[in-house]
Swiss-Prot record:
This is Palmitoyltransferase PFA4. One of its GO terms (cellular component) is endoplasmic reticulum membrane. GO terms for molecular function: protein-cysteine S-palmitoyltransferase activity. Its EC number is 2.3.1.225. The chain crosses the membrane at residues 10-30, 34-54, 122-142, 165-185. The gene is PFA4. PROSITE patterns: DHHC. The keyword Kinase does not apply. Belongs to the DHHC palmitoyltransferase family. PFA4 subfamily.
Length: 375
């Protein structure tokens, strides 16, 4: 679940304290007792890369739309009243940064900045170097603990009490940092590289799936299809009626996330050239306002209704609440003139609107920093 910090400065102060305490106390009170100068140097290089990546993740602007931007013809025409400009695809207005953010992933309390198109590589490198450094450090700690245990009965004082104290404190702390950051890193990699989605887009997919299974999505998609592609359903009234009444349609047959090409292309889109992946100042070279889409999103007038729905821009419901159609039967019984009368009424299932919907992690749009008032 997304974390909200009461005092924003704490979001930066806590990581700075943990990096300094774990890294430098380990260096001076544990590692210097048994590592070579070369090994200590490499550890400090890795620790320095954490600081550089963290600094870039904090101060690099995540990216904002250029003035005068206009969406393409078959994209949603979303206008931000606060920035007074049209929002490109995948863009959201951050309430805390007070700007529209290109490919907004989330507002990170630990950097006091949004994670977006321009600084996502710095954020990922920050996580990577934390994992690399704490992983190496945990290896050294375990090695030293093993040495201490094997020589616990030695007459010579091979390990000082001071070193034992810091080993006891730093080992579980280092393991905790490694575990939590690894989980966050895996989540980011799964979303952005495997599925080609930001965390907000992954949340959006869950919300749309919820609408689908509550039978509020398909009528809205058909309405949007006629809006984006006028005349797309002309003369197909019978097919539309059969499509709505059919219960065999699956979620994947009508919903396509257009920015998921393949893991390699997804990786290049969010991290840039492989030569820049570990470059502390590297990043993608595109403008972050127009993106390549997969073949499934190509519109063809001659295809079926399902295939046409797959060509809708993201999100396919245009963030609308969805149109309800009969989904739950409510049977009422009454007696009239000595005869029992049965009435079957259809009651639409209530679904919270987008700005009030929560996923299974307990996250709403506000948890990601999105300004729901201008969405």
């Amino acid at each position: 679940m997304a974390v909200l910090v009461k005092w924003p400065w704490l979001g930066v102060a806590i990581p700075c304290f943990l990096i300094s305490f774990t890294g430098y106390f380990a260096h001076f009170f544990v590692l210097t007792n048994f590592l070579s100068f070369k090994e200590l140097l490499w550890f400090q290089v890795s620790l320095s890369m954490i600081w550089i990546s963290y600094w870039k993740a904090i101060y690099k602007n995540p990216g904002r739309p250029t003035k005068g931007f206009r969406p393409l013809r078959y994209e949603w025409q979303n206008y931000c009243t606060k920035c007074e400009t049209y929002k490109p695809e995948r863009t959201h207005h951050c309430k805390r940064c007070n700007q529209c953010v290109l490919v907004m992933d989330h507002h990170c309390p630990w950097t006091m900045n949004c994670v977006g198109y321009k600084n996502f590589p710095h954020f990922i490198r920050f996580l990577f170097w934390i994992i690399a450094t704490t992983g190496i450090l945990l290896h050294y700690f375990v090695k030293r603990i093993k040495f201490t245990w094997v020589n616990r009965y030695a007459t010579a004082n091979l390990v000082s009490k001071q070193e034992l104290i810091f080993l006891t404190i730093l080992t579980p702390l280092d393991a905790f940092i490694l575990l939590t950051i690894s989980l966050l890193f895996v989540r980011c990699v799964k979303n952005q590289i495997v599925n080609g989605r930001t965390q907000i887009e992954a949340w959006e997919m869950d919300r749309i799936e919820n609408l689908f299974y509550h039978q509020r999505l398909l009528p809205q998609l058909l309405t949007n299809l006629k809006e984006i592609y006028p005349g797309s359903l002309e003369g197909q009234e019978k097919e539309v009626e059969e499509f709505l009444s059919s219960s065999t349609c699956s979620f994947d047959e009508v919903i396509n996330f257009p920015y998921d090409i393949n893991p390699w292309v997804n990786l290049l889109n969010c991290m840039g050239s492989p030569l820049n992946w570990l470059n502390p100042f590297g990043g993608p070279k595109a403008d972050g306002m127009v993106f390549q889409k997969n073949e499934i999103s190509d519109y063809d007038e001659a295809t079926s209704i399902q295939d046409k729905l797959l060509a809708l821009p993201w999100p396919p419901d245009d963030t609308r609440h969805g149109i309800a159609f009969p989904s739950v039967s409510h049977v009422e019984k009454d007696t009239q003139g000595g005869e029992q009368v049965v009435r079957r009424r259809h009651v639409p299932i209530a679904v919270p609107p987008r700005n009030e919907w929560y996923n299974d992690w307990g996250e709403s749009l506000e948890h990601f920093g999105v300004d729901v008032e201008v969405e």
